[in-house]
């Protein structure tokens, strides 16, 4: 069977050249006579892989020297707990901006550790927009302010990153890391599950300013303390070695594409193909405030569940798969991460045009 265009929100599409390289090196990595999956994480071979992955991420995101890059496990969902356990240590209070399901889950975990202040929320608008923050970030008696830069389920993103003077800004970038340029120095901590835009499932990346490491309470479990990973080059215990290796290959691929600025240009072009069609369509609509449209996750729907089901079935027959929207939103969702070629988006738009003509 030929490869399909996979619009899954995660685990998601990986660049074909990366998969082919993995296939080539799978049984015998670099003349070692064994697979990465069999290799000791204490070996010099793996040490060079994790070092290269870290330095590539630093280069691509222009990460300043005062930040650590940590390779973790447990997904972004474990970070919802690790962050308050490590950073909520002066005022025992943090601010959360609610823009979707994931930021809400992050807040709910933080409430188990300390006090949470909801600075702003777009829940009353069903998370179809990003709340305005004018003058809302003045409270300095917070240990950090948490945002989700891109809302995978609802299809929104921040256009401007909130300016926070004296409080560390913490960002969940799981679904748009490396998709557009960000000034890392504006953040105290950035985290992302790898399985959307970085690599395969099993790896979580954290980029943390060094002065935020080491402040966890003594009761914080060893494996939930950033200091454990910082002191041991992310090798305190066995890391997700294969996921780190594939992520390194994805970062090499991204560099070959021209880096983040080039991929951002490509992502803006790809998302415009779909948004331009949706804006003109009489059948398909998108619920998202146009100002805050995501470049990565694009929800859309028809007027009826029957048409949605028919659309999804026929799309699958054409090799356009995993387009079903999240159960909390319904309809359809196209996740068009870095690895999705423009041709895949164009094929989707062509099919949507045909479907609209058939169902006028």
UniProtKB/Swiss-Prot annotation:
InterPro entries: Aminotrans_V_dom (IPR000192), Aminotrans_V_PyrdxlP_BS (IPR020578), Pser_aminoTfrase (IPR022278), PyrdxlP-dep_Trfase (IPR015424), PyrdxlP-dep_Trfase_major (IPR015421), PyrdxlP-dep_Trfase_small (IPR015422)
Pathway the protein takes part in: Amino-acid biosynthesis; L-serine biosynthesis; L-serine from 3-phospho-D-glycerate: step 2/3
Recorded catalytic activity of this chain's protein: O-phospho-L-serine + 2-oxoglutarate = 3-phosphooxypyruvate + L-glutamate; 4-(phosphooxy)-L-threonine + 2-oxoglutarate = (R)-3-hydroxy-2-oxo-4-phosphooxybutanoate + L-glutamate
EC number: 2.6.1.52
Cofactor: record remark: Binds 1 pyridoxal phosphate per subunit.
Subcellular location: Cytoplasm
Gene3D superfamilies: Aspartate Aminotransferase, domain 1, Type I PLP-dependent aspartate aminotransferase-like (Major domain)
Binding site for L-glutamate: 42
Gene Ontology molecular function: any one: O-phospho-L-serine:2-oxoglutarate aminotransferase activity
Binding, pyridoxal 5'-phosphate: 76-77, 102, 152, 172, 195, 237-238
Protein name as catalogued: Phosphoserine aminotransferase
């Amino acid at each position: 069977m030929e490869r399909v265009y996979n619009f899954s929100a995660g685990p998601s599409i990986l660049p074909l050249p990366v998969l082919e390289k993995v296939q080539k090196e799978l049984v015998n990595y670099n003349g070692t006579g064994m697979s990465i999956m069999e290799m000791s994480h204490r070996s010099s071979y793996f040490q060079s892989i994790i070092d290269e992955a870290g330095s590539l991420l630093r280069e691509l995101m222009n990460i300043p020297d005062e930040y650590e890059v940590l390779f973790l496990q447990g997904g972004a969902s474990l970070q919802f707990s690790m962050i308050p356990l490590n950073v909520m240590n002066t005022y025992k209070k943090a601010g959360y901006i609610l823009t979707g399901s994931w930021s809400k889950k992050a807040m709910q975990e933080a409430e188990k550790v300390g006090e949470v202040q909801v600075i702003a929320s777009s829940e009353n608008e069903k998370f179809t927009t990003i709340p305005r923050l004018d003058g809302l970030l003045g409270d300095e008696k917070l240990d950090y302010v948490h945002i989700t830069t891109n809302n995978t389920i609802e299809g929104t993103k921040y256009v401007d990153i909130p300016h926070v003077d004296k409080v560390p800004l913490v960002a969940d970038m799981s679904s748009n890391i490396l998709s557009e340029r960000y000034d890392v120095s504006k953040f105290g901590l950035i985290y992302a599950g790898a399985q959307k835009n970085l690599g395969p499932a099993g790896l979580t990346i954290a980029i943390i300013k060094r002065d935020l490491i080491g402040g966890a309470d003594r009761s914080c479990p060893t494996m939930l303390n950033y200091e454990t990973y910082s002191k041991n080059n992310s090798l305190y215990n066995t890391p997700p070695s294969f996921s780190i290796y594939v992520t390194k290959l994805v970062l090499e691929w991204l560099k070959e594409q021209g880096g983040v600025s080039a991929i951002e240009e490509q992502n803006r072009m790809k998302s415009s193909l779909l948004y331009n069609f949706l804006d003109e369509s009489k059948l398909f609509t998108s619920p998202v405030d146009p100002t805050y449209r995501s470049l990565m996750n694009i929800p859309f729907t028809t007027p009826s569940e029957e048409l949605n089901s028919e659309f999804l079935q026929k799309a699958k027959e054409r090799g356009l798969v995993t387009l079903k929207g999240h159960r909390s939103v319904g309809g359809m969702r196209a996740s068009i991460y870095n690895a999705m070629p423009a041709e895949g988006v164009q094929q989707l738009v062509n099919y949507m045009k045909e479907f609209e003509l058939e169902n006028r």
